[in-house]
C-alpha cells in the first residue's frame, strides 16, 4: 500500500471515516492499528503512512460526528498529539524530546509543524461540535499548555556540555514554536462560535502568556539552524511571534465570548457594535482593558521595544484592537486611542502591514463611539488616497479603506456618500493641468497635525499610485453603498474625468472600474457607459493605445459575463458592439500604414462580442431593435474588410469568430422582406463603395472553395452575401452545426431569388468538412446529437426545397457514417419522427378542418411544423419513410447488433397505457426492420424455402425482445424458490412472500383511498403499483389472489379513465392467461364492478343526464369557442371509452367461456340482459358520441342470442336485442360530433355489420311476426342512419375523400318499405321511434301515420314535444282532434315557439295558452332572456294577458330581464325613427312599462334608476352633438370629451349591450365622432368587469346549459375587458338585433354538432325609437379600410400580416378564414343578407371574416336593385385566400363546411322561422308578410334528402363562385360611395 499516492490514501481514509456503520468501524480499526504500531516503535512516527492516518483523522473530525464517534476521535487525537509533542502520557506530561538522537532535529520540526496544528484544529472543532466533551478537551489542552510553559520556564542547565546545550535550545525552540501554533489555532477556532467555557479558558491562557515575561525569556533562542521557516512564523522572531499569536488569540477569544464569533465586532455591515446593557463578563473585559493600558503606556511601550529590539508597531495595533474591544464592552474609550492611531498612521511607510488593522480599528471605533466618527472618516479617506500599492494582485489598502468608509455611510445620510464620491472624483485630473490636486506637496494633505516632522517634509507624491487609489475608492464606495443613484453618479463622474492625458495605467484602471460598477447601474446609466466604451474604441482605431483598447475589451467582456443572457444590459451591449464593428468597417478611411490600429480595434470588439453572444436566445430579444439585421451587417462588414475565412488575418481570430458563429442568427429570416435582391442592394454595408479588387478576391475565394457555384448571374451584393454565408456557416460547421445552412431556404424571399442553388452548393461543400470533422471525434457530443435531431426535423419540413436539401445531407452522412444510428437518440429520433408524420397524416380522418400544425414528441425533444395541406403531409411521410428505411438498413449492415438492440429498446421503452393510439409507424418500422437484421446464426440462410416460406430472423428478433421485456419488468416479489429447499429456506420464502403481499395490498389500498378522496394520482404511480400487485398475485394461492385481484379490478373502475382501463384490461387478460383457473373469478368481479358502476355512478353511456337541444340552451352573443365543444367531446369520450373497452373484453372472452365455463357465460348473459333492459327502458344517454357503443352492445347481444335461440330464453333475448337497437332511433336524427372521420367510419362499420347480421337472422331463423317486423324496421332505420352519416362523411363526392367505408347507395334514404304494422310494433317499444321516423324520411304518408298515432294515443304522446309539432303542422289553428286537457300536460315546447302561440292564426284556446306559459316558465331566465324581442311582440296579440303576466313575473325575478324588456318596449313604441308615428302596440307597451316600473321598490328601484340615469347621460351626448354636425371632427371630438367627463359612474351600472358585465371604468378620452350626414353617432370605450367559469364540467354545461346550474365543480373567475360601443341616434337597430339573434341561434346549432365553423354574433340593443347601442368588434378592420390602405387584395393582406403561404401564421389564419367564410356564406343565403359591400365585411386579427350592418335582409335590397343575385359573396380575392381555385384543399374545406352547416341547420328550419314569424308585424322593412317565411323555408330545401341537400348547397357555391353580379355591386359601391374593392 506504500506505493499508493499519499493524497489518494488520505482521501480514501477520510471517506471511509465519513461513512456510517461499517465504514466507520473499518476506519477505527485502521486508526487503532497504526496507533499500536506507534506504541510499539516510536520511530515509526516518521512514516508517511502514520502522518496520513493522523491527517485523515483530523479531517474526519471536522465532519459533525455522533457523540460516541467523537469520543473515539478525541482519544485518537489525544494519543497522537502527545506523541508528536514527545510528551509522556502521565499526569505531568514530561518531555522525552531530549532522548532523541540529535540527527533527527533538522527534520523533526517540519514534520510536527505540519501535523500538530491540524490536531489542535480538530480538537477545537470537537469542542465546538460536542459540548458534552468540551470540558474534557479543554482540560486536556490546558494540561498541554501548562506542560509547554513549564518546559519553557525551566532555566538553562549550568552544564557546559555543548551537546546538552544544543539539545536544550532545540527543545525550547520546539516547544516555543508549538506554543505559538497553539495560539494560532485558538485564534482561528474563535472565528466560529466556541462555548463560553472554552473562550474563557482561551482568554486565561493568553493572559497568562502576555502578563508573564515568557516570550522575552526566549529572545536568545534565535538560532537559525533550528528555526523552520513556516508560515506560522510570518517572518517575525520567535519571541515576537509568541506575543503576536497570543494577542491575536486574545482578541478573537474575547470577541467570541461577546458576540459568539470573533468577526462580528469588526463586521460593521452586519450590525453596529455597541456596549451591551447587561455585562456578565465585566470582570474579564476590565482585566483586558488593564492589560492593554499597561502595554500602551509609555513605560510599557518602551520596555517592550527595548527587550525585543524592534518598533513592535504590529503588536501595538493588536493591543489597540484588544483595548477597543474591551472598552466597547465596558462603554468607555480613553482619548489616547486617537493619539495612538495618529502615531501608527505615521509609521505606515515603514510598516504598511499595519493598515488593514488600523482600517478595521478606525471603522469600529467610529461605530461604537460616534464622537470619533469624523476623526475616523477623515483618516480613512486619506488612507484611501495615499496608501501604498503593491503589484501582488491582492486587494489594495485603498480598497479596504474605502470599503470601510462606504460601510460607515450606512450609519450616516446618503449625502455623505455622494459628497465623498465627488471629493474623490475631483482629485482625478491629469498631472499637467492646473487643477491637479494630487500633484501638490504632501503637507497640504497631512494625515494629522501630530505627525512627526519627518512625515511633513515636502516630497513629490506618487501621483499614479494615488490616482489608482482614488479610482479604487470610487469603485468600492459605489459597490458597497449599493444605491442606484450612487452607481449612476460614479459612472457619470468617472466618464467626465476620463482623459487621454492620464498615464495609460490610470486610464485602463478607470475603464475597468466603470465595468465593475456598470452591472449594478440602472439601464439608463448603463447605456451611457456602453456608448462611452464604443466612442472610445472608435477613436482608438486611429489613435492607437493598445493597453487602453485591451482594457475596453476586457471591460466589455466582464460586463457580458456579469449580465444575464437576453437581459436589457446584455442586449444593449450587444447592440453597441455590433453597431461599432459595422461603423468601423463602413467609415474606414485609414491610410495603409495605420491599418494595424484599425484591425486591432475591430478584433478587440470582436473578442468582446464573443462573450456577449454566449447563451443568447434570439427569439426573446426585442424585435424593434433588429438584432438579426445588425448581425447580418456585421458579417457583411467582416467579409468586405478582409476578415474572411481564407484570409490570414481572419484566421488569427478564427476561434473568436467560430464562437460568434456558433451563437449567431442566420443572415436571413422569414420576416426579411418580400424581395431579397432589393433588400441586399439597399443594405447599409453592401451599398458602400467596395473596391473592385476586394470583389474579385471574394469571387475567386468562392470559386476555389465551392467549385459548383455559379456567380455569373449574381450581383455584387449577392456575391458578398454568399461570401458572408460561407464564412459564417463554415465557422459554424466547425462546431458541428450544419442545419443552419438548410434553414436559409426557409426564407420565402430567398427561395424566390437566384440564390437557392448557391446555398445548396455551400451546404454540400460544408457537408464534407462536417463529416470529416465528425469522423475524427471519438465520441459524439450531446450538442452534435441535438444538431442531428434538428437536421432530421428539417427532413420533415413542409417546404420542399428545405426538405430535399436536408434529406440530401442526411443521406450523405448516413452513407459515410452509418455507425451514427448506433446512437440511441439519433435512431429513436428517426422512429419518432416517422410516428409523428403518420399521426399528422391521419389527422385528416380525426380533425380535418383545424389540423394541428406543430407536432412534438413526448419521448425526445423533437418538434416538426407541417403544412395544413394533407397531400403535402402525405408526400413528406412517403419521402421520410423511404429514406428512414434506407438509413436503418444501411446501418444494420455495418453495426447489426447495436441497431438490433436499439430497436428492441425502442419497443421496450414504449409507454403503453398513456396513449390510446393503436398505430405507431415508428414501432411498426422497428419491428419490420428489426426482423430483417442478419442473424447471428448464418447457417439458417442456406436452408431452402420449405412450405413456401423463406427462413428469416423474425423469430430471433422477437425472442430477444421477449426476453428483454420479461427481465426488464421482473418484480422483486417474484422469489426464487429453486435450489435449497430446507425448512429454514421455505420459512424464509413464505415470510418474504407474506411481507410482499402486505406491501402490495397496502399500496393498492392507498391508491383506492387517494382516488376516492379526489387526490391526484399520477398515471406512472397507478401503472407501477397495479402491475407489481398483478405480478405478485398470480403466484399466490386462491385466497391471497382473490384479495389482490379484487383491488386490481376495482381500481380502474374508481379512476374510470381510458388509460386506467386499458392498463386494467391488459393486466386482467394476462392474469387470466397466467392462471386460467382464476379466470371466472376475475370475470365475475369485472362484471360486478361494471354493474355497480352502471347502477350507482351512472357515468358516460349510462348517465341519466340528457343532452338538450341547442334551442333549449342559452344563446350567447360571443364568438365561437372551439375549445368549449372540444372539451365537451373529450369529457364524453373519456367516459364512453371505458365502457367500450369493457365490452370488448367481455365479448372477446364470451365464446371461450360459452364452450369452457358455461356458468361464467351465463353470468355474462344475465349482465347483458340487464344492460339491454336499461337501454329499452331509456335509462341510457343516447348522445351522438355513444352511437358506436350502443350498436356494439346490440351486436354483442345478437351474438349471445344466436347461442340461445334454441332455448326459451333465446327468443326473448333476441327480441330484447332488436328493441334495444330500435331505441337508438327514439330521438331526433343526429349527425356526428366534431370532424372525426374515423369515428364516423367505425359507426358505419358497426351498423353495417349489425344490419348484415339481422339480414342473416331473417334468412336462417323462423321468428315471430312482431319480431320480424321490428327487425325489418331496424334494418331500414340502420340503412337510413348509415346513409345520413355517409353523407356527412363525404359531403363533396367529387372532392378529396379518404376511402374509409364502402359507399352507401341512395336507395337507403327511401322510406317506402316502412309499413303501418312496423310502426305499431315500434310504438310498443317506444313511441319516440314512430314520432321521429318522419324526421328521417321525406315521406308525407309516414308523417300522416305518425300523426294518426298521436291522435289515437294522446296520453302516451304528451311526453314527446315532437308530437305537438305534427299537430300544429296539420292543424295550425290549434284546434286539435284530441281532448284539450292533454295539452296542459304536454312536454314543454322550445322557448322560441312560445311567442308564436299568441299570433292570430292560432285560435283562442285557454289550455293552449296555459301550456305555452308553462313551457316558457319551465326554462331559466338565462334562456328566455334571449327572446326578449319576440316576447315583447307577443303583447301585440295577447288579448288574455298571459304574455303580460309572464313579463311581469319574470321581471320580478330578474332585474336584467326587466331592463332589457323596458328598452325593447321603448324601441317599439313608434314605427319611425323620429318617434312621430306611434305603433298600434304603444298603449299596451306603455301600460306594461308603467306596471313594471311601479312594481319596483327598494334596491331594485335604485338599481333601475342608477342604470337608466347613467345610460341616458351617455346617449344624451348625441343630442348635444347635433349642433356640431357640420363642424370638423376635432371639434366634435372635443365636445364628446367634454360631455364624457361629466358622466357619473354609479355602482353596478352596465351597458345595455353587455348585461353580463358591470362597468368599472370609462375611458373619458375615447369618444370618437362617427361619419353621418344628419345624425350624431359616436363611439366610446368602457372597462367592463365580467365573470367566466373555470374548470366547469363541459358535459354538465351541455346538459344544463346555464352557468348557474353548472355544478359545484365550476368556479367563477373575474376578469376585466375594455369594450368599445357605438351609440346611434336616428337609426333603427331592431333589424340588426333580429339578425344577430338569428346568427346566435345558428351558432348554437353548429356548436351542437361540433362543427368547425366560426361566427361572432356581436351585441346590438335597441333602446329607443331610432336609438341603440352596438358593440364594436375588437381587433378588426373592414375590407373597405384595407382598400384605402392600398392593399391589393385579401390574399396580399394575409401574406403581409401573417407571412408567406408556407408560414404557420398564414395557414392558421387561412383556416380561420375558411371556417368563418363557410358559416357566414350559409347564413347569408338563408337569411338573404344584401348590401355586402366591402364596408360591411370585416377581417379580424386572426383571419376570420365577419359581417356587420344588416340593414338589408330577407326580402329587401338597397334601392330595390337586385344587383346581388348570387346566393352569397364569394369573390376572386376570397377564393385566392382559400387556395386560388375550387380544386385546392382549403376551398374543398369551405365546400364541405358549407354543406355540413347547411345540413346541420335544416332540422331547425321551422324554429328559426318561428323566431322571425312573430316579428312580421313589428314594422321592420325587411318583411313582406307571410311570404317572407315561405321563402325562408324554401331556402332550407326541406323537400330534399341529405345527399340532395348537399348537392343543392354545392350548386349554390358554384353559382356564387366569382359571380359577376357580385363584382358589379362592388363596382357600383365604389362609384357611388367610394368604397374600394
UniProtKB/Swiss-Prot annotation:
Residue segments, region Pleckstrin homology (PH) domain conferring phosphoinositide binding specificity: 1492-1625
Record flagged with keyword Transport: no
Sequence ranges assigned to domain PI3K/PI4K catalytic in this UniProt record: 1593-1861
Region (G-loop): 1599-1605
SUPFAM superfamilies listed in its UniProt record: ARM repeat, Protein kinase-like (PK-like)
Subcellular location: Cytoplasm
GO cellular component terms, semicolon-separated: cytoplasm; mitochondrion; plasma membrane
Region (Catalytic loop): 1728-1736
Annotated segments matching region Activation loop: 1747-1771
Residues of the PIK helical domain: 1305-1491
A GO MF label: 1-phosphatidylinositol 4-kinase activity
Pfam family for this entry, one: PI4K_N
Reactions this protein catalyses: a 1,2-diacyl-sn-glycero-3-phospho-(1D-myo-inositol) + ATP = a 1,2-diacyl-sn-glycero-3-phospho-(1D-myo-inositol 4-phosphate) + ADP + H(+)
Keyword list, A-Z: ATP-binding, Cytoplasm, Kinase, Nucleotide-binding, Transferase
Keyword Transmembrane helix annotated: no
Protein's job: Acts on phosphatidylinositol (PI) in the first committed step in the production of the second messenger inositol 1,4,5,-trisphosphate.
UniProt record similarity statement: Belongs to the PI3/PI4-kinase family. Type III PI4K subfamily.
Name of the protein: Phosphatidylinositol 4-kinase stt4
Organism: Schizosaccharomyces pombe (strain 972 / ATCC 24843) (Fission yeast)
Amino acid at each position: 500500500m506504500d506505493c499508493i499516492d499519499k493524497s489518494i490514501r488520505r482521501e480514501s481514509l477520510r471517506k471511509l471515516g465519513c461513512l456510517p456503520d461499517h465504514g466507520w468501524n473499518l476506519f477505527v480499526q485502521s486508526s487503532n492499528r497504526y496507533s499500536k504500531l506507534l506504541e510499539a516503535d516510536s520511530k515509526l512516527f516518521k512514516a508517511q503512512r502514520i502522518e496520513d492516518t493522523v491527517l485523515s483523522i483530523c479531517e474526519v473530525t471536522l465532519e459533525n460526528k455522533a457523540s460516541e464517534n467523537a469520543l473515539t476521535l478525541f482519544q485518537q487525537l489525544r494519543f497522537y498529539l502527545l506523541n508528536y509533542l514527545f510528551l509522556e502520557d502521565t499526569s505531568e506530561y514530561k518531555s522525552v524530546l531530549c532522548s532523541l538522537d540529535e540527527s533527527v532535529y533538522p527534520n523533526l520540526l517540519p514534520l510536527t509543524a505540519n501535523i500538530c496544528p491540524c490536531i489542535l484544529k480538530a480538537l477545537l472543532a470537537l469542542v465546538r461540535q460536542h459540548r458534552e466533551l468540551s470540558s474534557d478537551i479543554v482540560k486536556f489542552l490546558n494540561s498541554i499548555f501548562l506542560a509547554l510553559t513549564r518546559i519553557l520556564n525551566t532555566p538553562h542547565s549550568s552544564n557546559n556540555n555543548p551537546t546538552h546545550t544544543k539539545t536544550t535550545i532545540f527543545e525550547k525552540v520546539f516547544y516555543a514554536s508549538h506554543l505559538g501554533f497553539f495560539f494560532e489555532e485558538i485564534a482561528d477556532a474563535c472565528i466560529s462560535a466556541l462555548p463560553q467555557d472554552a473562550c474563557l479558558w482561551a482568554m486565561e491562557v493568553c493572559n497568562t502568556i502576555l502578563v508573564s515575561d515568557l516570550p522575552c525569556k526566549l529572545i536568545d533562542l534565535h538560532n537559525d539552524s533550528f528555526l523552520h521557516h513556516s508560515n506560522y512564523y510570518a517572518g517575525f522572531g520567535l519571541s515576537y511571534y509568541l506575543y503576536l499569536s497570543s494577542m491575536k488569540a486574545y482578541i478573537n477569544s474575547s470577541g467570541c465570548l461577546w458576540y459568539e464569533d470573533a468577526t462580528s465586532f469588526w463586521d460593521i455591515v452586519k450590525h453596529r457594535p455597541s456596549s451591551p446593557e447587561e455585562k456578565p463578563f465585566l470582570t474579564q473585559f476590565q482585566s483586558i482593558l488593564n492589560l492593554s493600558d499597561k502595554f500602551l503606556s509609555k513605560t510599557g511601550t518602551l520596555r517592550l521595544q527595548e527587550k525585543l529590539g524592534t518598533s513592535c508597531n504590529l503588536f501595538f495595533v493588536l493591543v489597540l484592537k484588544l483595548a477597543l474591544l474591551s472598552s466597547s464592552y465596558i462603554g468607555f474609550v480613553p482619548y489616547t486611542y486617537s493619539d495612538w492611531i495618529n502615531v501608527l498612521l505615521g509609521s505606515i511607510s515603514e510598516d504598511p502591514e499595519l493598515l488593514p488593522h488600523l482600517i478595521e480599528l478606525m471603522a469600529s471605533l467610529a461605530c461604537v463611539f460616534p464622537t470619533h466618527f469624523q476623526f475616523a472618516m477623515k483618516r480613512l479617506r486619506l488612507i484611501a488616497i495615499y496608501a501604498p500599492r503593491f503589484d501582488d494582485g491582492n486587494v489594495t489598502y485603498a480598497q479596504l479603506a474605502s470599503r470601510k468608509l462606504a460601510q460607515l455611510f450606512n450609519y450616516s445620510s446618503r449625502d455623505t456618500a455622494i459628497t465623498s464620491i465627488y471629493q474623490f472624483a475631483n482629485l482625478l485630473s491629469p498631472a499637467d493641468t492646473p487643477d491637479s490636486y494630487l500633484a501638490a506637496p504632501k503637507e497640504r494633505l497631512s494625515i494629522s497635525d501630530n505627525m512627526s516632522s519627518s512625515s511633513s517634509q515636502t516630497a513629490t507624491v506618487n501621483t499614479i499610485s494615488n490616482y489608482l487609489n482614488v479610482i479604487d475608492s470610487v469603485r468600492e464606495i459605489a459597490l458597497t453603498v449599493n444605491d442606484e443613484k450612487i452607481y449612476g453618479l460614479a459612472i457619470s463622474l468617472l466618464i467626465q474625468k476620463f482623459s487621454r492625458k492620464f498615464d495609460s495605467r490610470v486610464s485602463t484602471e478607470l475603464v475597468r472600474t466603470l465595468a465593475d460598477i456598470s452591472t449594478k447601474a440602472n439601464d439608463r446609466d448603463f447605456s451611457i457607459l456602453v456608448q462611452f466604451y464604443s466612442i472610445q474604441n472608435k477613436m482608438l482605431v486611429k489613435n492607437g493605445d493598445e493597453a487602453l483598447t485591451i482594457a475596453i475589451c476586457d471591460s466589455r467582456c466582464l460586463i457580458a459575463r456579469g449580465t444575464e443572457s437576453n437581459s436589457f444590459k446584455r442586449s444593449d451591449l450587444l447592440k453597441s458592439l455590433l453597431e461599432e464593428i459595422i461603423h468601423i468597417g463602413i467609415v474606414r478611411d485609414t491610410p495603409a500604414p495605420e491599418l494595424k490600429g484599425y484591425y486591432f480595434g475591430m478584433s478587440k470588439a470582436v473578442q468582446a462580442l464573443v462573450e456577449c453572444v454566449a447563451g443568447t436566445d434570439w427569439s426573446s430579444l426585442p424585435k424593434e431593435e433588429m438584432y438579426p439585421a445588425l448581425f447580418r451587417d456585421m458579417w457583411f462588414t467582416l467579409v468586405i474588410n478582409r476578415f474572411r475565412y481564407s484570409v490570414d488575418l481572419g484566421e488569427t481570430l478564427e476561434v473568436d469568430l467560430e464562437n460568434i458563429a456558433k451563437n449567431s442568427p442566420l443572415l436571413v429570416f422569414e420576416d426579411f422582406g418580400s424581395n431579397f435582391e432589393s433588400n441586399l442592394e439597399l443594405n447599409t454595408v453592401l451599398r458602400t463603395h467596395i473596391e473592385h479588387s476586394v470583389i474579385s478576391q471574394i469571387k475567386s475565394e468562392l470559386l476555389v472553395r465551392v467549385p459548383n457555384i455559379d456567380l455569373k448571374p449574381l450581383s455584387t451584393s449577392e456575391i458578398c452575401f454568399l461570401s458572408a454565408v460561407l464564412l459564417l456557416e463554415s465557422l459554424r460547421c466547425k462546431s458541428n452545426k450544419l442545419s443552419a445552412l438548410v434553414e436559409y431556404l426557409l426564407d420565402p424571399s430567398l427561395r424566390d431569388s437566384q440564390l437557392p442553388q448557391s446555398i445548396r452548393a455551400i451546404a454540400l461543400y460544408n457537408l464534407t468538412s462536417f463529416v470529416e470533422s465528425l469522423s475524427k471525434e471519438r465520441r459524439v457530443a450531446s450538442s452534435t446529437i441535438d444538431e442531428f435531431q434538428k437536421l432530421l426535423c428539417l427532413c420533415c419540413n413542409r417546404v420542399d426545397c428545405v426538405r430535399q436539401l436536408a434529406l440530401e445531407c442526411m443521406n450523405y452522412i448516413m452513407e459515410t457514417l452509418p455507425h451514427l444510428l448506433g446512437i440511441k437518440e439519433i435512431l429513436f429520433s428517426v422512429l419518432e419522427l416517422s410516428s409523428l408524420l403518420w399521426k399528422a397524416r391521419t389527422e385528416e380522418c380525426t380533425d380535418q378542418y383545424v389540423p394541428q400544425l406543430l407536432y412534438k414528441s413526448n419521448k425526445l425533444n423533437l418538434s416538426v411544423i407541417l403544412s395544413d395541406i394533407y397531400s403535402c403531409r402525405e408526400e413528406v411521410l412517403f419521402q421520410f419513410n423511404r429514406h428512414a428505411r434506407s438509413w436503418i438498413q444501411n446501418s444494420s449492415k455495418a453495426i447489426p447488433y447495436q441497431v438490433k438492440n436499439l430497436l428492441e429498446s425502442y419497443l421496450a421503452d414504449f409507454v403503453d397505457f398513456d396513449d390510446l393510439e393503436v398505430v405507431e409507424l415508428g414501432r411498426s418500422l422497428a419491428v419490420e426492420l428489426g426482423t430483417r437484421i442478419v442473424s447471428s446464426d448464418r447457417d439458417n440462410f442456406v436452408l431452402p424455402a420449405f412450405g413456401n416460406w423463406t427462413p428469416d430472423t423474425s423469430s430471433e428478433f422477437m425472442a430477444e425482445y421477449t426476453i428483454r421485456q420479461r427481465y426488464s419488468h421482473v418484480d422483486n416479489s417474484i422469489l426464487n424458490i429453486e435450489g435449497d429447499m430446507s425448512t429454514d429456506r421455505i420459512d424464509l420464502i413464505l415470510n418474504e412472500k407474506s411481507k410482499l403481499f402486505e406491501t402490495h395490498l397496502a399500496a393498492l389500498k392507498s391508491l383506492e383511498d387517494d382516488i376516492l378522496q379526489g387526490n391526484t394520482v399520477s398515471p406512472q404511480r397507478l401503472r407501477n403499483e397495479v402491475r407489481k400487485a398483478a405480478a405478485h398475485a398470480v403466484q399466490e394461492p386462491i385466497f391471497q389472489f382473490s384479495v389482490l385481484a379484487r383491488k386490481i379490478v376495482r381500481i380502474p373502475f374508481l379512476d374510470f379513465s381510458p388509460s386506467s382501463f386499458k392498463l386494467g384490461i391488459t393486466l386482467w387478460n394476462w392474469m387470466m392467461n397466467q392462471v386460467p383457473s382464476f379466470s371466472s373469478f376475475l370475470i365475475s368481479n369485472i362484471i360486478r364492478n361494471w354493474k355497480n358502476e352502471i347502477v350507482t355512478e351512472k357515468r358516460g353511456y349510462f348517465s341519466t343526464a340528457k343532452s338538450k337541444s341547442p334551442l333549449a340552451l342559452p344563446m350567447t352573443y360571443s364568438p365561437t369557442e372551439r375549445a368549449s365543444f372540444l372539451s365537451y367531446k373529450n369529457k364524453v369520450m373519456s367516459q364512453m371509452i371505458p365502457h367500450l373497452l369493457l365490452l370488448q373484453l367481455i365479448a372477446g372472452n364470451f365464446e371461450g367461456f360459452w364452450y369452457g365455463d358455461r356458468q361464467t357465460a351465463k353470468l355474462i348473459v344475465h349482465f347483458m340482459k340487464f344492460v339491454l333492459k336499461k337501454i329499452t327502458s331509456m335509462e341510457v344517454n343516447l348522445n351522438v358520441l355513444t352511437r358506436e357503443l350502443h350498436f356494439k352492445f346490440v351486436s354483442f347481444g345478437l351474438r349471445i342470442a344466436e347461442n340461445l335461440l334454441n332455448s326459451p330464453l333465446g327468443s326473448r333475448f333476441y327480441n330484447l336485442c332488436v328493441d334495444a337497437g330500435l331505441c337508438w332511433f327514439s330521438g331526433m336524427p343526429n349527425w356526428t360530433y366534431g370532424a372525426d372521420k374515423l369515428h364516423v367510419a367505425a359507426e358505419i362499420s358497426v351498423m353495417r355489420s349489425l344490419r348484415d347480421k339481422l339480414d342473416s337472422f331473417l334468412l336462417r331463423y323462423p321468428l315471430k311476426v312482431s319480431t320480424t317486423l321490428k327487425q325489418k324496421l331496424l334494418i331500414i332505420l340502420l340503412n337510413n342512419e348509415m346513409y345520413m352519416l355517409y353523407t356527412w362523411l363525404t359531403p363533396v363526392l367529387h372532392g378529396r375523400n379518404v376511402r374509409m367505408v364502402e359507399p352507401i347507395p341512395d336507395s337507403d334514404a327511401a322510406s317506402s318499405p316502412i309499413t303501418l304494422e312496423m310502426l305499431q310494433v315500434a310504438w310498443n317499444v317506444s313511441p319516440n321511434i314512430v314520432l321521429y321516423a318522419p324526421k328521417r324520411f321525406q315521406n308525407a304518408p309516414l308523417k300522416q301515420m305518425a300523426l294518426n298515432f298521436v291522435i289515437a294515443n294522446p296520453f302516451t304522446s304528451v311526453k314527446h314535444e315532437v308530437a305537438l309539432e305534427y299537430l300544429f303542422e296539420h292543424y295550425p289553428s290549434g284546434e286539435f282532434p284530441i281532448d284539450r286537457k292533454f295539452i296542459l300536460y304536454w312536454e314543454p315546447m322550445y322557448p322560441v315557439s312560445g311567442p308564436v302561440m299568441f299570433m292570430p292564426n292560432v285560435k283562442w284556446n285557454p289550455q293552449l295558452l296555459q301550456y305555452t306559459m308553462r313551457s316558457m316558465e319551465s326554462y331559466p331566465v338565462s334562456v328566455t332572456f334571449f327572446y326578449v324581442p319576440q316576447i315583447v311582440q307577443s303583447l301585440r296579440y295577447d288579448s288574455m294577458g298571459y304574455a303580460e303576466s309572464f313579463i311581469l313575473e319574470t321581471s320580478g325575478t330578474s332585474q336584467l330581464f326587466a331592463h332589457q324588456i323596458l328598452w325593447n318596449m321603448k324601441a317599439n313604441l313608434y314605427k319611425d325613427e323620429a318617434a312621430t308615428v306611434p305603433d298600434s302596440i304603444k298603449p299596451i307597451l306603455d301600460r306594461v312599462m308603467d306596471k313594471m316600473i311601479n312594481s319596483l321598490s327598494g334596491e331594485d328601484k335604485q338599481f333601475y334608476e342608477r342604470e337608466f340615469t347613467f345610460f341616458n347621460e351617455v346617449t344624451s351626448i348625441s343630442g348635444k352633438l347635433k349642433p356640431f354636425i357640420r363642424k370638423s371632427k376635432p371639434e366634435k371630438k372635443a365636445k364628446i370629451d367634454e360631455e364624457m367627463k361629466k358622466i357619473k359612474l354609479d355602482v353596478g351600472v352596465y351597458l345595455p349591450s353587455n348585461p353580463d358585465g358591470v362597468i368599472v371604468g370609462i375611458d373619458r378620452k375615447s369618444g370618437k365622432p362617427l361619419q353621418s350626414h344628419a345624425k350624431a353617432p359616436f363611439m366610446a370605450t368602457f372597462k367592463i368587469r365580467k365573470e367566466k367559469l373555470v374548470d366547469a364540467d363541459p358535459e354538465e354545461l351541455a346538459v344544463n346549459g346555464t352557468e348557474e346550474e353548472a355544478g359545484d365543480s365550476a368556479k367563477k373567475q373575474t376578469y376585466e375587458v375594455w369594450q368599445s360601443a357605438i351609440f346611434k341616434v336616428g337609426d333603427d337597430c331592431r333589424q340588426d338585433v333580429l339578425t344577430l339573434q338569428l346568427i346566435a341561434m345558428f351558432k348554437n346549432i353548429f356548436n351542437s354538432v361540433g362543427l368547425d365553423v366560426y361566427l361572432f354574433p356581436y351585441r346590438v340593443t335597441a333602446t329607443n325609437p331610432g336609438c341603440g347601442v352596438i358593440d364594436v368588434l375588437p381587433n378588426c378592420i373592414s375590407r373597405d379600410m384595407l382598400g384605402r390602405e392600398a392593399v391589393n387584395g385579401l390574399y396580399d393582406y394575409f401574406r403581409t400580416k401573417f407571412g408567406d403561404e408556407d408560414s404557420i401564421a398564414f395557414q392558421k389564419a387561412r383556416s380561420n378564414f375558411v371556417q368563418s367564410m363557410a358559416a357566414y356564406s350559409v347564413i347569408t343565403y338563408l337569411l338573404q343578407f344584401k348590401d355586402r359591400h366591402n364596408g360591411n365585411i370585416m377581417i379580424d386579427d386572426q383571419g376570420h371574416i365577419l359581417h356587420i350592418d344588416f340593414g338589408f335582409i330577407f326580402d329587401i335590397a338597397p334601392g330595390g336593385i337586385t344587383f346581388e343575385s348570387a346566393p352569397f359573396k364569394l369573390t376572386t380575392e376570397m377564393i385566392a385566400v382559400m387556395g386560388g381555385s375550387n380544386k385546392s384543399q382549403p376551398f374543398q374545406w369551405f365546400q364541405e363546411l358549407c354543406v355540413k352547416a347547411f345540413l346541420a341547420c335544416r332540422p331547425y328550419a321551422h324554429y328559426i322561422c318561428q323566431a322571425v314569424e312573430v316579428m312580421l308585424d313589428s314594422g321592420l322593412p325587411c318583411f313582406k308578410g307571410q311570404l317572407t317565411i315561405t321563402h325562408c323555408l324554401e331556402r332550407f330545401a326541406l323537400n330534399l334528402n341529405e345527399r340532395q341537400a348537399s348537392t343543392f348547397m354545392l350548386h349554390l357555391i358554384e353559382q356564387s363562385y366569382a359571380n359577376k353580379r357580385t363584382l358589379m355591386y362592388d363596382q357600383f359601391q365604389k362609384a357611388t360611395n367610394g368604397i374600394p374593392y
